């Protein structure tokens, strides 16, 4: 079968379903594909196709994730759904599936449950910026007052974790009823609710800023000298763009920030007018000595990112089966933290009342590195011991 060409006509947004086990995340995902398929915007994907999601390995961590795609009139969406709670935790911490917004599914019959809370907390911690709520299984609730009560509870919970609980769109419906009906019409009592949800997602979750529009950043992978021309750093542009004549800062591994000017940009030995996010390039730097730059530093737009040593993080600790530790670790644990292209030693401070961390746990912690690294909220990292990955984390707040 010939592959369809991906037409880049609509803005692209990444979303995902989150919420407590058995509240209907996967059924809703299926219902969205069925309803949108009626308007030619999706391939209908059945529950069991989504539920038996293949396991993927992201940085050595096994995560089961289902990916579906669909289109509304306004946008193209990539949607992730995970079968198990542990998969969500790993997914959100590793950033394996970046979400520009999440659809929180809450069963109207049960109200918010422990994983509802945990997923909202994780969304807040790892920087999922927007949430839209689908209050599911309303066919099982006869009392409209009960429905109002659940909605209020959900709004309060969202507010508790610093989401705008009063503004967040909440759509009520039944994913199962929409699936059973299958007409996919907007006028339909059940299918119409799925359309209402997609309208809310379309309007409430903004189109994310493209990587090329963000401030320039390139992690340095290699450094060499070209006789008579100067020092060249190579790497893949993570975001933004860079051209000859741009002023950049060299940040990380030293306390001071070094300013320089890009005097040449090359890609595959060819001279480039401008390099953009995703390009693997070499940059010639004015007046910089080979000894002043090393792998693990970054080139960045002046003022856009700072070197730090101390930060808070949300961390997932690999299980023994995933190749992680076989034993717990304690306060003062000193592994390597792998940021972008290099390892830096750091010390772990556990929250008060936490004695130890077991393989398979996810935990908030404070980390202090022995040398500064260019760090910002949302940056992902790996925790390593002797070259093997034992954990994955995301920076949730800078301390110093």
From Swiss-Prot:
Disulfide bonds: none annotated. SUPFAM superfamilies: EF-Tu/eEF-1alpha/eIF2-gamma C-terminal domain, P-loop containing nucleoside triphosphate hydrolases, Translation proteins. Residues 60-64 are annotated as: G2. It is found in: Cytoplasm. It comes from the Bacteria. Mg(2+) binds at residue 26. It is an enzyme of class 3 (hydrolase). Gene3D superfamilies: P-loop containing nucleotide triphosphate hydrolases, Translation factors. Residues 19-26 are annotated as: G1. GTP binds at residues 19-26, 81-85, 136-139. GO terms for molecular function: GTP binding; GTPase activity; translation elongation factor activity. It holds the Pfam family GTP_EFTU_D2. It catalyses: GTP + H2O = GDP + phosphate + H(+). Residues 174-176 are annotated as: G5. Transmembrane segments: none annotated. Its EC number is 3.6.5.3. Residues 10-209 form the tr-type G domain. CDD domains: EF_Tu (cd01884), EFTU_II (cd03697), EFTU_III (cd03707). Keywords: Cytoplasm, Elongation factor, GTP-binding, Hydrolase, Magnesium, Metal-binding, Nucleotide-binding, Protein biosynthesis. GO terms for cellular component: cytosol. Belongs to the TRAFAC class translation factor GTPase superfamily. Classic translation factor GTPase family. EF-Tu/EF-1A subfamily. GTP hydrolase that promotes the GTP-dependent binding of aminoacyl-tRNA to the A-site of ribosomes during protein biosynthesis. PANTHER family: ELONGATION FACTOR TU, MITOCHONDRIAL, ELONGATION FACTOR TU-RELATED. This is Elongation factor Tu. It comes from Moorella thermoacetica (strain ATCC 39073 / JCM 9320). The lineage of its organism: Bacteria, Bacillati, Bacillota, Clostridia, Moorellales. The gene is tuf.
